[in-house]
């Protein structure tokens, strides 16, 4: 007899998460744009757009980023977006984008 395969896809709680940007992260975006725009305005706009879109990938897998032990017990993590580091914190159903910067910046 043939086997019957059934595939079910169900959304987890992660699908119900939302993204919020801290004021410092928004300032970081403005700072990065201001730094890049005088050289190439189009590249600056594309960079900011990719950084703004990046956290959307976290909605389905919020724990994909590397956890930063120095912030425990908070759940602070980091991901790399091209040559930029983005730090975020998971609190209940909210992903807070905390800070972002170019990896070559002195931090």
Report the location of each language-model feature.
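Enriched for short, Lys/Arg-rich terminal
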Residues: 2-12, 81-107
């Amino acid at each position: 007899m043939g086997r019957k395969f059934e595939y079910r896809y169900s959304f987890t709680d992660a699908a119900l998460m939302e993204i919020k940007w801290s004021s410092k992260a928004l300032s970081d975006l403005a700072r990065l744009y201001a730094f890049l725009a005088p050289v190439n305005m189009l590249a600056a706009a594309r960079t900011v757009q990719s950084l703004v879109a990046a956290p959307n990938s976290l909605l389905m897998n919020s724990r994909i980023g590397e956890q930063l032990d120095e912030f425990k017990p908070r759940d602070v993590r980091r991901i790399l977006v091209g040559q930029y580091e983005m730090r975020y914190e998971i609190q209940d159903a909210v992903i807070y984008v905390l800070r972002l910067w170019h990896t070559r910046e002195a931090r």
